[in-house]
């Protein structure tokens, strides 16, 4: 059922067109500077960042370093006073809000309850696409029947058993999945998330991670801000460290966490003397099994 949404995204991956250098990236920030007041210190300082199409990219770093401000620049809530931002090669300044938020950019808020409007999960989902009637609208310009679109998103985000519940009665993880479902109904090519695992348990983190990886595999580009290093190491393709308004290092996630003394995982801290490249529990188990197999073969 989730194919209704994912097949459209998968088609983007299969296009074999020649693209300009700008168009190779879903997100490209060039030399961006931003401050909240004219004479106040810069929060974003000469920031350059490139994220490929279909990539799941995580940003980690301390509070107040400029991570959330960067998301606000990407979502056009604020604008840099110097530098440029491009989405799939197009200057962000040229986007109209309607174009940007209907089919291009999706923003998952830190507080999912801020976007709940109706008394049941199902009605809340339909509210995103202009209600149940199958008629063309600005909220729902595609030809697929709304029921099929809802069905696909519900399957993808695993909401089947929750459709008659009030959104406020859901657990933290369930609310996060509902918020994600609402954002995905707008068919974004790029998904921005601020601390999506905050306040949810490991079971729901795993479910969320699997959903995000599936979206990434089908061409959706994901930029996530997080303090959850375990989640980043497990699911993100690349991780960058934000410090004093800029990304100071950016590497493939396993390499990032394996070579980091401060931003690393519990598994890496415990096992790095024996398995320095292991950053998740699964990595450690795999390394132990491999060592045992090699010992037996000898």
Describe each model-derived feature in a short phrase.
Residues 1-25, 263-298:
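ABC ATPase nucleotide-binding domains
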Residues 60-62:
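The feature captures the beta-strand-to-loop junction immediately N-terminal to the Walker
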Residues 75:
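Helix-to-loop junction immediately C-terminal to a conserved catalytic motif
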Residues 83-91, 101:
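Conserved ABC transporter NBD signature motif
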Residues 141-162:
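Conserved ABC ATPase "signature" region
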Residues 166-170, 174:
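Conserved ABC ATPase signature
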Residues 191-194:
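Catalytic Walker B motif of ABC-type/P-loop ATPase nucleotide-binding domains
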């Amino acid at each position: 059922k989730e194919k209704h949404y994912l097949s459209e995204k998968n088609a983007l991956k299969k296009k074999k067109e020649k693209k300009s250098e700008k168009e190779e990236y879903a997100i490209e920030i060039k030399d961006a500077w931003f401050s909240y007041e004219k004479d106040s210190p810069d929060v974003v300082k000469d920031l350059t960042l490139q994220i490929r199409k279909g990539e799941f990219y995580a940003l980690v770093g301390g509070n107040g370093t400029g991570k959330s401000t960067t998301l606000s620049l990407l979502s056009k809530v604020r604008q840099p006073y110097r530098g440029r931002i491009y989405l799939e090669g197009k200057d962000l300044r040229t986007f109209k809000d309607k174009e940007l938020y209907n089919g291009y950019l999706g923003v998952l808020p830190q507080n999912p309850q801020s976007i709940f409007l109706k008394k049941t999960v199902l009605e809340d989902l339909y509210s995103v696409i202009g209600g149940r009637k199958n008629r063309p609208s600005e909220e729902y310009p595609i030809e697929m029947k709304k029921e099929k679109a809802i069905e696909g998103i519900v399957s993808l985000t695993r909401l089947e058993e929750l459709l008659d519940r009030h959104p406020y009665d859901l657990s933290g993880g369930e609310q996060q999945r509902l918020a994600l479902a609402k954002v995905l109904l707008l068919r974004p090519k790029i998904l921005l998330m601020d601390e999506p695992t905050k306040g949810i348990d490991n079971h729901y983190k795993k479910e969320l991670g699997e959903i995000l990886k599936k979206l990434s595999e089908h061409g959706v580009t994901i930029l996530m801000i997080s303090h959850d290093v375990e989640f980043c190491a497990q699911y993100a393709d690349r991780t960058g460290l934000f410090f004093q308004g800029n990304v100071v290092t950016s590497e493939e996630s396993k390499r990032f966490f394996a070579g980091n003394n401060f931003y690393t995982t519990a598994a890496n801290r415990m096992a790095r003397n024996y398995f320095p490249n292991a950053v998740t529990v699964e990595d450690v188990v795999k390394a132990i099994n491999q060592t045992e197999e090699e010992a037996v073969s000898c």
